[in-house]
Swiss-Prot record:
The active site is at residues 146, 167, 185, 250. Catalyzes the ATP- as well as the pyrophosphate-dependent phosphorylation of a specific serine residue in HPr, a phosphocarrier protein of the phosphoenolpyruvate-dependent sugar phosphotransferase system (PTS). HprK/P also catalyzes the pyrophosphate-producing, inorganic phosphate-dependent dephosphorylation (phosphorolysis) of seryl-phosphorylated HPr (P-Ser-HPr). Keywords: ATP-binding, Kinase, Magnesium, Metal-binding, Multifunctional enzyme, Nucleotide-binding, Serine/threonine-protein kinase, Transferase. Homohexamer. Belongs to the HPrK/P family. The gene is hprK. This is HPr kinase/phosphorylase.
Length: 323
Protein backbone atom coordinates (compact mmCIF):
# COMPACT_ATOMS: atom_id res chain seq x y z
CA UNK A 1 0.00 0.00 0.00
CA UNK A 2 1.22 3.51 -0.84
CA UNK A 3 1.04 5.92 2.11
CA UNK A 4 3.28 8.73 0.92
CA UNK A 5 2.86 11.86 3.01
CA UNK A 6 0.75 10.15 5.69
CA UNK A 7 2.05 11.12 9.14
CA UNK A 8 0.85 11.00 12.72
CA UNK A 9 -0.09 14.66 12.42
CA UNK A 10 -2.16 14.17 9.26
CA UNK A 11 -3.97 11.14 10.69
CA UNK A 12 -4.70 13.04 13.92
CA UNK A 13 -5.98 16.11 12.05
CA UNK A 14 -8.28 14.03 9.81
CA UNK A 15 -9.74 11.84 12.56
CA UNK A 16 -9.57 13.77 15.86
CA UNK A 17 -13.13 15.09 15.61
CA UNK A 18 -14.67 11.77 14.52
CA UNK A 19 -13.15 9.54 17.20
CA UNK A 20 -12.45 12.23 19.84
CA UNK A 21 -8.66 11.93 19.86
CA UNK A 22 -6.51 13.86 22.36
CA UNK A 23 -2.73 14.15 21.94
CA UNK A 24 -1.16 13.61 25.38
CA UNK A 25 2.51 12.79 24.71
CA UNK A 26 5.17 12.65 22.01
CA UNK A 27 4.32 15.95 20.31
CA UNK A 28 7.79 16.00 18.74
CA UNK A 29 6.84 12.89 16.72
CA UNK A 30 4.27 14.69 14.58
CA UNK A 31 6.15 13.70 11.41
CA UNK A 32 6.30 10.02 12.41
CA UNK A 33 5.11 7.79 9.54
CA UNK A 34 4.75 4.12 8.66
CA UNK A 35 7.92 2.23 7.81
CA UNK A 36 8.13 2.37 3.99
CA UNK A 37 8.92 -1.32 3.52
CA UNK A 38 6.26 -2.38 6.04
CA UNK A 39 3.59 -0.24 4.35
CA UNK A 40 4.53 -1.55 0.89
CA UNK A 41 4.17 -5.17 2.02
CA UNK A 42 0.80 -4.55 3.71
CA UNK A 43 -2.03 -6.11 1.72
CA UNK A 44 -4.83 -4.18 3.45
CA UNK A 45 -5.46 -1.59 6.13
CA UNK A 46 -5.99 -4.45 8.60
CA UNK A 47 -2.20 -4.91 8.56
CA UNK A 48 -1.62 -1.27 9.51
CA UNK A 49 -3.71 -0.88 12.67
CA UNK A 50 -4.86 -3.23 15.41
CA UNK A 51 -4.85 -4.13 19.09
CA UNK A 52 -1.54 -4.14 20.96
CA UNK A 53 0.65 -6.74 19.26
CA UNK A 54 4.40 -7.04 19.77
CA UNK A 55 4.70 -9.40 16.80
CA UNK A 56 3.72 -6.50 14.50
CA UNK A 57 5.18 -3.47 16.30
CA UNK A 58 5.37 -1.28 13.17
CA UNK A 59 1.63 -0.74 12.93
CA UNK A 60 -0.65 1.64 14.82
CA UNK A 61 -1.14 0.09 18.26
CA UNK A 62 -4.53 0.48 19.98
CA UNK A 63 -4.71 -0.27 23.70
CA UNK A 64 -8.19 -0.83 25.10
CA UNK A 65 -9.24 -1.88 28.59
CA UNK A 66 -7.99 -5.51 28.24
CA UNK A 67 -4.56 -4.37 26.98
CA UNK A 68 -4.14 -1.75 29.71
CA UNK A 69 -5.19 -4.31 32.35
CA UNK A 70 -2.66 -6.77 30.96
CA UNK A 71 0.03 -4.09 30.91
CA UNK A 72 -0.61 -3.14 34.53
CA UNK A 73 -0.34 -6.77 35.67
CA UNK A 74 3.21 -7.08 34.31
CA UNK A 75 6.18 -6.63 36.60
CA UNK A 76 8.41 -3.60 36.04
CA UNK A 77 11.13 -5.55 34.23
CA UNK A 78 8.71 -7.16 31.76
CA UNK A 79 7.02 -3.81 31.13
CA UNK A 80 10.31 -2.16 30.27
CA UNK A 81 11.36 -4.99 27.98
CA UNK A 82 8.08 -5.23 26.05
CA UNK A 83 7.57 -1.49 25.70
CA UNK A 84 11.22 -1.14 24.72
CA UNK A 85 10.70 -3.63 21.89
CA UNK A 86 7.60 -1.77 20.77
CA UNK A 87 9.06 1.75 20.89
CA UNK A 88 12.35 0.68 19.28
CA UNK A 89 10.68 0.02 15.90
CA UNK A 90 8.95 3.41 15.94
CA UNK A 91 5.23 2.76 15.40
CA UNK A 92 3.41 5.79 13.91
CA UNK A 93 1.57 6.32 17.21
CA UNK A 94 -0.21 4.60 20.10
CA UNK A 95 -3.87 5.03 21.04
CA UNK A 96 -5.26 4.40 24.52
CA UNK A 97 -8.99 3.83 23.99
CA UNK A 98 -12.08 2.93 26.04
CA UNK A 99 -11.64 6.09 28.13
CA UNK A 100 -8.69 4.53 29.97
CA UNK A 101 -5.92 6.62 31.49
CA UNK A 102 -2.49 5.84 30.00
CA UNK A 103 -0.11 4.34 32.59
CA UNK A 104 2.38 7.02 33.77
CA UNK A 105 5.43 4.98 32.76
CA UNK A 106 4.02 4.44 29.24
CA UNK A 107 3.31 8.16 28.88
CA UNK A 108 6.83 8.97 30.09
CA UNK A 109 8.42 6.52 27.66
CA UNK A 110 6.41 7.98 24.75
CA UNK A 111 7.51 11.49 25.72
CA UNK A 112 11.19 10.51 25.89
CA UNK A 113 11.09 8.63 22.57
CA UNK A 114 8.92 11.23 20.74
CA UNK A 115 6.32 8.53 20.08
CA UNK A 116 2.87 10.14 19.66
CA UNK A 117 0.37 8.93 22.26
CA UNK A 118 -3.34 9.60 21.76
CA UNK A 119 -6.28 8.94 24.07
CA UNK A 120 -9.98 8.62 23.28
CA UNK A 121 -13.20 7.69 25.11
CA UNK A 122 -14.30 5.69 22.05
CA UNK A 123 -14.09 1.89 22.22
CA UNK A 124 -10.94 0.27 20.88
CA UNK A 125 -12.91 -1.77 18.32
CA UNK A 126 -14.57 1.38 16.94
CA UNK A 127 -11.19 3.17 16.76
CA UNK A 128 -9.65 0.28 14.82
CA UNK A 129 -12.60 0.06 12.41
CA UNK A 130 -12.53 3.82 11.79
CA UNK A 131 -8.78 4.01 11.21
CA UNK A 132 -8.80 0.97 8.92
CA UNK A 133 -11.53 2.53 6.79
CA UNK A 134 -9.63 5.83 6.72
CA UNK A 135 -6.35 4.20 5.71
CA UNK A 136 -8.12 2.10 3.06
CA UNK A 137 -9.58 5.23 1.52
CA UNK A 138 -6.41 7.34 1.42
CA UNK A 139 -4.24 4.49 0.12
CA UNK A 140 -6.72 3.18 -2.46
CA UNK A 141 -5.82 3.34 -6.18
CA UNK A 142 -7.39 6.35 -7.88
CA UNK A 143 -7.71 7.93 -11.31
CA UNK A 144 -9.33 11.01 -12.87
CA UNK A 145 -11.38 10.39 -16.02
CA UNK A 146 -12.99 12.73 -18.54
CA UNK A 147 -16.76 12.57 -18.92
CA UNK A 148 -20.07 13.22 -17.19
CA UNK A 149 -20.84 11.06 -14.15
CA UNK A 150 -24.52 10.73 -13.26
CA UNK A 151 -26.87 8.91 -10.94
CA UNK A 152 -29.38 7.28 -13.28
CA UNK A 153 -32.03 5.11 -11.64
CA UNK A 154 -29.73 4.61 -8.66
CA UNK A 155 -26.79 3.48 -10.79
CA UNK A 156 -23.53 5.38 -11.27
CA UNK A 157 -23.12 5.96 -15.03
CA UNK A 158 -20.12 7.58 -16.73
CA UNK A 159 -20.86 9.12 -20.13
CA UNK A 160 -17.71 9.28 -22.26
CA UNK A 161 -16.89 10.27 -25.83
CA UNK A 162 -14.93 12.59 -28.04
CA UNK A 163 -15.13 16.34 -27.56
CA UNK A 164 -18.11 17.88 -29.32
CA UNK A 165 -20.39 14.83 -29.21
CA UNK A 166 -22.74 16.44 -26.69
CA UNK A 167 -21.92 14.69 -23.41
CA UNK A 168 -22.79 17.71 -21.27
CA UNK A 169 -25.98 18.40 -23.24
CA UNK A 170 -27.00 14.78 -22.74
CA UNK A 171 -26.19 15.13 -19.04
CA UNK A 172 -28.38 18.24 -18.83
CA UNK A 173 -31.25 16.41 -20.53
CA UNK A 174 -30.96 13.50 -18.09
CA UNK A 175 -30.86 15.88 -15.11
CA UNK A 176 -34.03 17.56 -16.39
CA UNK A 177 -35.63 14.09 -16.45
CA UNK A 178 -35.02 13.68 -12.71
CA UNK A 179 -31.58 12.07 -12.56
CA UNK A 180 -28.65 13.44 -10.55
CA UNK A 181 -25.28 14.98 -11.41
CA UNK A 182 -22.16 13.77 -9.64
CA UNK A 183 -19.44 15.41 -11.75
CA UNK A 184 -18.84 16.96 -15.16
CA UNK A 185 -15.64 17.09 -17.22
CA UNK A 186 -13.31 15.58 -14.57
CA UNK A 187 -14.40 12.71 -12.33
CA UNK A 188 -12.26 11.34 -9.50
CA UNK A 189 -12.57 7.57 -9.15
CA UNK A 190 -11.15 5.51 -6.29
CA UNK A 191 -11.23 1.73 -5.89
CA UNK A 192 -12.34 1.09 -2.31
CA UNK A 193 -12.80 -2.68 -2.54
CA UNK A 194 -12.33 -5.72 -4.76
CA UNK A 195 -15.49 -4.89 -6.75
CA UNK A 196 -16.25 -1.33 -5.69
CA UNK A 197 -15.25 1.88 -7.49
CA UNK A 198 -16.56 5.18 -6.15
CA UNK A 199 -16.77 8.38 -8.19
CA UNK A 200 -16.73 11.92 -6.81
CA UNK A 201 -16.49 15.45 -8.12
CA UNK A 202 -13.34 17.52 -7.51
CA UNK A 203 -14.19 20.31 -5.02
CA UNK A 204 -13.46 23.01 -7.60
CA UNK A 205 -16.13 21.68 -9.99
CA UNK A 206 -18.80 20.84 -7.39
CA UNK A 207 -22.38 21.14 -8.76
CA UNK A 208 -21.17 22.67 -12.06
CA UNK A 209 -22.02 21.57 -15.61
CA UNK A 210 -20.49 23.22 -18.68
CA UNK A 211 -22.71 23.43 -21.77
CA UNK A 212 -21.54 24.95 -25.03
CA UNK A 213 -23.31 28.23 -25.67
CA UNK A 214 -24.61 28.49 -22.10
CA UNK A 215 -21.36 28.37 -20.17
CA UNK A 216 -21.23 27.07 -16.60
CA UNK A 217 -24.52 26.05 -14.99
CA UNK A 218 -24.93 25.61 -11.23
CA UNK A 219 -27.12 22.51 -11.25
CA UNK A 220 -27.85 22.66 -7.52
CA UNK A 221 -29.12 26.25 -7.78
CA UNK A 222 -31.13 25.68 -10.97
CA UNK A 223 -32.69 22.27 -10.27
CA UNK A 224 -32.47 22.03 -6.49
CA UNK A 225 -30.68 19.94 -3.88
CA UNK A 226 -32.00 16.63 -5.21
CA UNK A 227 -30.38 17.17 -8.63
CA UNK A 228 -26.83 16.60 -7.36
CA UNK A 229 -25.05 13.72 -5.65
CA UNK A 230 -21.85 13.69 -3.60
CA UNK A 231 -20.70 10.26 -4.76
CA UNK A 232 -21.87 7.13 -6.57
CA UNK A 233 -20.65 3.61 -7.22
CA UNK A 234 -19.54 3.21 -10.84
CA UNK A 235 -21.56 0.47 -12.53
CA UNK A 236 -21.85 1.41 -16.21
CA UNK A 237 -19.93 3.29 -18.89
CA UNK A 238 -21.80 4.77 -21.87
CA UNK A 239 -19.47 5.49 -24.79
CA UNK A 240 -20.83 7.98 -27.34
CA UNK A 241 -19.45 7.33 -30.84
CA UNK A 242 -19.84 9.06 -34.18
CA UNK A 243 -22.11 7.51 -36.76
CA UNK A 244 -19.23 6.65 -39.09
CA UNK A 245 -17.28 4.80 -36.39
CA UNK A 246 -16.20 1.56 -38.09
CA UNK A 247 -15.77 -0.28 -34.80
CA UNK A 248 -19.43 0.05 -33.82
CA UNK A 249 -21.34 -3.26 -33.55
CA UNK A 250 -25.06 -3.07 -34.12
CA UNK A 251 -25.77 -6.22 -32.11
CA UNK A 252 -22.71 -7.14 -30.01
CA UNK A 253 -22.82 -10.80 -29.03
CA UNK A 254 -20.26 -10.46 -26.26
CA UNK A 255 -20.53 -8.00 -23.40
CA UNK A 256 -18.14 -5.06 -23.62
CA UNK A 257 -16.10 -3.85 -20.67
CA UNK A 258 -13.81 -0.95 -19.84
CA UNK A 259 -10.93 -1.55 -17.46
CA UNK A 260 -10.99 1.04 -14.67
CA UNK A 261 -8.37 0.66 -11.93
CA UNK A 262 -8.11 -3.04 -12.73
CA UNK A 263 -11.86 -3.66 -12.48
CA UNK A 264 -13.93 -4.46 -15.61
CA UNK A 265 -16.91 -2.07 -15.87
CA UNK A 266 -19.78 -2.96 -18.21
CA UNK A 267 -19.83 -0.62 -21.24
CA UNK A 268 -22.35 0.13 -23.97
CA UNK A 269 -21.75 2.16 -27.12
CA UNK A 270 -24.39 4.52 -28.49
CA UNK A 271 -24.11 6.16 -31.90
CA UNK A 272 -24.74 9.90 -32.05
CA UNK A 273 -26.89 10.96 -35.00
CA UNK A 274 -29.49 13.59 -35.79
CA UNK A 275 -32.95 12.68 -34.52
CA UNK A 276 -31.82 10.09 -31.98
CA UNK A 277 -33.15 10.55 -28.45
CA UNK A 278 -29.96 9.83 -26.56
CA UNK A 279 -31.49 10.39 -23.12
CA UNK A 280 -34.07 7.65 -23.72
CA UNK A 281 -31.38 5.35 -25.10
CA UNK A 282 -29.16 5.88 -22.03
CA UNK A 283 -32.09 5.20 -19.69
CA UNK A 284 -32.86 2.02 -21.63
CA UNK A 285 -29.20 0.97 -21.40
CA UNK A 286 -29.29 1.48 -17.64
CA UNK A 287 -32.52 -0.49 -17.25
CA UNK A 288 -31.06 -3.29 -19.39
CA UNK A 289 -27.91 -3.32 -17.25
CA UNK A 290 -30.03 -3.63 -14.12
CA UNK A 291 -31.73 -6.67 -15.69
CA UNK A 292 -28.33 -8.17 -16.56
CA UNK A 293 -27.20 -7.76 -12.95
CA UNK A 294 -30.31 -9.71 -11.97
CA UNK A 295 -29.40 -12.51 -14.39
CA UNK A 296 -31.76 -11.52 -17.22
CA UNK A 297 -29.97 -11.33 -20.60
CA UNK A 298 -32.42 -10.39 -23.36
CA UNK A 299 -29.99 -11.10 -26.22
CA UNK A 300 -29.09 -14.53 -24.89
CA UNK A 301 -32.76 -15.35 -24.34
CA UNK A 302 -33.52 -14.36 -27.95
CA UNK A 303 -30.61 -16.46 -29.25
CA UNK A 304 -31.85 -19.45 -27.25
CA UNK A 305 -35.36 -19.01 -28.69
CA UNK A 306 -33.94 -18.67 -32.20
CA UNK A 307 -31.81 -21.78 -31.76
CA UNK A 308 -34.79 -23.75 -30.46
CA UNK A 309 -36.93 -22.56 -33.39
CA UNK A 310 -34.24 -23.57 -35.91
CA UNK A 311 -33.90 -27.00 -34.32
CA UNK A 312 -37.66 -27.49 -34.34
CA UNK A 313 -37.78 -26.43 -38.00
CA UNK A 314 -34.98 -28.85 -38.88
CA UNK A 315 -36.80 -31.70 -37.11
CA UNK A 316 -40.09 -30.95 -38.91
CA UNK A 317 -38.33 -30.86 -42.29
CA UNK A 318 -36.63 -34.18 -41.56
CA UNK A 319 -39.97 -35.75 -40.68
CA UNK A 320 -41.48 -34.34 -43.89
CA UNK A 321 -38.79 -35.99 -46.01
CA UNK A 322 -39.41 -39.34 -44.28
CA UNK A 323 -43.06 -39.13 -45.18
Amino acid sequence: MELTGVTSQSIFDDNAADIKLSWVAGLEGADRAFDVEFAREATSAADLVGHLNLIHPNRIQVLGKPEITYYQRLDDETRKRQMGELILLEPPFLVVADGMEPPPDLELRCTRSSTPLFTTPVSSAAVIDHLRLYLSRISAPRVTMHGVFLDILGMGVLIMGESGLGKSELGLELISRGHGLVADDAVDFVRLGPDFIEGRCPPLLQNLLEVRGLGLLDIKTIFGETAVRRKMKMKLVVQLVRRNDGEFERLPLDSQYLDVLGLPIHMVKIQVAAGRNLAVLVEAAVRNTILRLRGIDTLRDFMDRQRAAMQADAVSRGQGRLL
